[in-house]
Design a protein with these regions (language model features):
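Acidic carboxylate motifs that coordinate Ca2+ or other divalent cations, activating on Asp/Glu
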Residues: 228
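Acidic, low-complexity Ser/Thr/Gly/Pro-rich repeat segments typical of extracellular/periplasmic
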Residues: 30-211, 216-220, 234, 238, ...
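Long, low-complexity intrinsically disordered regulatory regions
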Residues: 253-261, 267
């Protein structure tokens, strides 16, 4: 009898343990199905350039029959708002075609280039990593059709002339002063000529114009709301400076990178106050006469 009791107790304990094990397994399985793996910390870093073909800052590039430019990154990337973010300096009649390939982008130039000219492809924040969309700010690809790269720099600030607030994302146009010989031409410069160099202000209104020549420029700022590289009176804000400015003759300025806002900051050398005008043309006094009754006898 004692032996039978011991066996019964053992069987009961075994059954209890089995039931408890099944309950715990079901509970853990339910919990596991409700939780998802964290996958580690969120990726907050932009793509890193690992190769450019041809090399950045290359010279003596052909005027026609351009080879494709390939820019490779350390991860897969995406293009966002490239029509709005991307621009060239100077402007090209046919905008380059940008496509994705592997872990990089391909840029196909489609325009005949000018001789002995430095070109800059400015991508803004169009290039982003494929997973989190982290932008690679202010990436530039620079080359020259001549033996040298123009290397002069000017900094400036664009502000609303009425509110004194900064004007972000406005384009800065640089025209060689020797192409504008008189006041009348100066007034119509942005209608008659194409800028020799282009820069764009950051969100804080600061701009840094790079790869300029060591010559005197006339400087204009245009908001360009339609992203067509054309000034449209009554729609776009515009600003201009009366004098001419040679980057070689300007004082040095400090420049640093704001890691929080993620753009370059500089002490401005030029200040452009922008306004909206239906007819951007100054009135010029062409003749001065006194009425006959007020003339001296």
């Amino acid at each position: 009898m004692i032996t039978m009791d011991i066996r019964k107790r053992h069987i009961v304990r075994t059954l209890r343990a089995a039931v408890l094990l099944l309950f715990v397994s079901a509970f853990l399985s339910r919990c596991a199905s409700m939780m998802t793996p964290t996958g580690g910390p969120r990726d907050s870093l932009p793509p890193v350039i690992v190769n450019m073909t041809p090399d950045n800052f290359s010279t003596n590039r052909p005027l026609v029959n351009h080879e494709k430019i390939y820019i490779e990154f350390d991860e897969f990337v995406q293009l966002k708002d490239q029509q709005k973010e991307f621009f060239t300096s100077p402007a090209m009649k046919k905008k380059p075609l940008i496509t994705l390939r592997g872990r990089g982008i391909v840029v196909q130039l489609r325009d005949t280039l000018a001789p002995n000219t430095t070109y800059a492809l400015n991508f803004g924040s169009a290039i982003r990593d494929n997973n989190e969309g982290n932008p690679l700010y202010s990436m530039r690809y620079v080359f020259s059709t001549g033996p040298e790269i123009d290397s002069m720099v000017l900094s400036g600030y664009t502000a609303d002339s009425y509110k004194a607030d900064s004007v972000s994302k406005s384009f800065i146009w640089f025209f060689p002063a020797d192409s504008v010989e008189n006041v009348a031409e100066y007034d119509s410069t942005i209608f008659k000529y194409k800028p020799a160099a282009i820069a764009r202000a950051e969100n804080n209104g600061i701009f840094i114009a790079q790869n300029l020549k060591p010559i005197a420029y006339r400087v204009y700022a245009v908001q360009d709301k339609n992203d067509n590289q054309i000034y449209e009176p009554g729609s776009d804000q515009v600003g201009f400076l009366e004098g001419t400015y040679n980057p070689r003759e300007q004082p040095d300025f400090a420049m640093w990178y704001d890691s929080i806002r993620q753009y370059v900051v500089a002490e401005p050398q030029l200040y452009l106050r922008m306004f909206t005008d239906k007819a951007f043309r100054r009135q010029v006094l062409s003749q001065s006469e006194r009425p006959l009754q007020h003339q001296a006898m």
